[in-house]
């Protein structure tokens, strides 16, 4: 009788950014994000499954389950294979279940759309996007193989296994002491009625990126600054009078690969907080843009990002904290997360311009991205001439979203809006 030898089990420690997610994961905040690619034609499930099978070989760290140790969480390699299925549950539903050994990502489809959902402890948006683009490469070149029989396009994410596995927080940690304490100022907190089953409400706006860039340039600023200011104004318009004493603070994730060399497929991001106090500043858009622009200039520097990275990494390098049991670390991280949340109103995440090999572009209509949310969030990305801005919110109310898109429409921007009203799950 032939016996097949199992691969040896491999263990990987969570990177610094990943450690906050497991103790703070629950039904109200699943810590899951989604990438969507809408194709020109209906998705073929069998070809998509083949593409996933090829892709996972190139990203072995994603073929892991999350385990609890005495002192730390860790990833354990698994023989489980991802199974492609038609979309069957609400967006960004739970992927990490403490008592289950399951993969931490999922590939689903619906009509012309392919969805990649990933648990944030596994990777950030940039890392997951490398996986997603590789998956799309295999899918498109297989489904339309007659179009590529003379020559295959280049795969534009060719990092080695070691580079994809890299813990870039550890690599770039300098040990620099950050003595100044970070004070959390209470921010305005958006309230609302949640759906009974914590279903995420997603509203997607598709528009011409050139129109938004032209608007931003009219105000002598960038697309991100312009849309951040617009989001703040949309929130301000719904603030109760008694709450206007608190600043509006938007948390903005930053891809650290832009500032520190890395092509890791894992987490390597930081966050900056952009604050605007309407009691001390005017509420017209020009004034908000000016204030937001100054905040970005002040916060988005290599020096500040390095200090923030060192401050967060210091915990795991602390000799005492290394021997503290995991259940105490979990309590500390939950407490820290609650304190941090008091200083944040909402989140805005700009993935930026998504590119693929020029030979693949004709088969793709658009990309989209959004996160699970404890509060309203914006996720946005562009592909070709199209910018997609997605609001994800745990609340039934949509007044902030309406304010935001209405202001863009009043500026002459043509917007196609859809919502996640289709019932799944």
Give names to the regions the model predicted:
Residues 59-69, 144-169, 215-230, 330-346:
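Short, charge-rich amphipathic segments
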Residues 135, 139-143, 235, 296, ...:
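Short, well-ordered alpha-helical segments in soluble proteins
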Residues 98-141, 151, 155-164, 382-398:
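Histidine-centered acyl-transfer/condensation active-site motif
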Residues 34, 117, 193-195:
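A short, mixed-charge helix-start or loop-turn motif at secondary-structure junctions
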Residues 40-56, 117-133, 204-240, 389-391, ...:
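Acyl activation and transfer enzymes in specialized metabolism, enriched
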Residues 1-71, 79-106, 237-425:
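Acyl-thioester-dependent acyl-group transfer interface
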Residues 1-16, 122-130, 134-214, 408-425:
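Non-catalytic, low-complexity flexible loops and terminal extensions
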């Amino acid at each position: 009788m032939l016996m097949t030898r199992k691969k040896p089990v491999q263990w990987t420690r969570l990177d610094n950014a990943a450690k906050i997610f497991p103790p703070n994961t629950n039904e109200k905040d699943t810590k899951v994000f989604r990438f969507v690619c809408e194709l020109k034609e209906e998705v073929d499930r069998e070809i998509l499954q083949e593409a996933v099978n090829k892709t996972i070989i190139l990203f072995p760290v994603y073929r892991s389950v999350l385990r609890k140790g005495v002192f730390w969480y860790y990833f354990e390699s698994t023989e489980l294979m991802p199974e492609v299925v038609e979309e069957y549950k609400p967006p960004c539903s739970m992927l990490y279940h403490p008592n289950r050994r399951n993969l931490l990502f999922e590939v689903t489809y619906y009509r012309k759309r392919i969805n990649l959902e990933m648990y944030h402890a596994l990777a950030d948006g940039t890392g997951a996007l490398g996986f997603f683009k590789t998956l799309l490469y295999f899918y498109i070149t297989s489904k339309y193989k007659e179009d590529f029989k003379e020559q295959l396009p280049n795969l534009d994410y060719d990092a080695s296994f070691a580079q994809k596995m890299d813990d870039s927080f550890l690599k770039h940690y300098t040990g620099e002491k950050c003595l100044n304490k970070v004070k959390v100022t209470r921010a305005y907190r958006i309230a609302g009625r949640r759906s009974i089953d914590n279903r995420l409400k997603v509203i997607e706006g598709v528009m011409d990126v050139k129109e938004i860039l032209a608007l931003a340039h009219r105000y002598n600023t960038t697309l991100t600054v312009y849309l951040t200011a617009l989001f703040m104004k949309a929130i301000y318009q719904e603030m109760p009078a008694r709450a206007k004493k608190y600043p509006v603070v938007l948390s903005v994730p930053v891809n650290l690969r832009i500032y520190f060399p890395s092509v890791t497929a894992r987490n390597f991001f930081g966050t900056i907080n952009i604050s605007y106090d309407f009691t001390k500043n005017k509420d017209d858009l020009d004034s908000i843009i000016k204030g937001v622009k100054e905040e970005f200039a002040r916060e988005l520097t290599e020096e500040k990002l390095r200090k923030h990275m060192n401050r967060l990494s210091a915990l795991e390098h602390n000799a005492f904290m290394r021997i503290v049991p995991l259940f105490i670390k979990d309590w500390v991280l939950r407490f820290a997360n609650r304190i941090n949340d008091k200083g944040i109103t909402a989140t805005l995440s700009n993935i930026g311009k998504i590119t693929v090999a020029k030979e693949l572009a004709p088969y793709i209509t658009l990309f989209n991205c959004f996160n699970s949310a404890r509060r309203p969030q914006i996720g946005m990305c562009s592909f070709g001439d199209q910018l997609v801005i997605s609001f994800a919110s745990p609340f039934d109310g949509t007044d902030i979203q309406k304010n935001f898109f209405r202001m863009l429409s009043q500026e002459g921007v043509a917007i196609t809006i859809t919502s996640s009203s289709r019932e799944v799950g």
